[in-house]
Amino acid sequence: MESAPRLDNKSRMSREVHVRFCEGLGVRFPRATRLVILCRSPELAVRALEIVGNWVADNGLTLHPTKTQVVDSRTNSFSFLGYEFHGTKHWPRKKSLQQLKGSLKRKTRRTSGDSLEWIIADVNRTLRGWFCYFQHSTRSSVYRGLDSWLRMRLRSLLRRRAGGRGVARDQTASFTWPNAFFAERGLFSLTTAHAKACQSSRR
């Protein structure tokens, strides 16, 4: 069970609430602190929320009214710090993917006058930063989907420069500019990076 309260002020959490990520006698929380408390049963989760609620009230703080909830992650998912959690699985939440795509769209407009090399270098900076945080997804399909979508964007840009029109989703565009074409030009692959990260974690 997850009880996910959010604290909305600077505070100090004592061992009265058993938050085990700190071994000191207290924990300093910055403004709008978010935390997840894992419990073995619904009853313990409700009790944990009650303890936290009493503690924050005693210290002049408040829990966020809509983001504080008790969730059984075995049957329902919940969002936390950009990820979606369900049981033992976790992946970038929909909003996180939308934000990344929005940033990449602005960098890969078909009307861009920048060279492909410059665009790829610019895109790579965004991809590496995003992957640094979101490399822990248990769904590898997330990375494959983003890689495919980005190559489609770049093919559409190249097709326009070659005098063509429309979004390059057809086989002709994939044949003209295959995946290897972009790899040879240094396009960062989320799929490849995730595979390497998984290999490293198994060592």
Model segments located where?
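Non-catalytic terminal/accessory segments
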Residues: 1-203
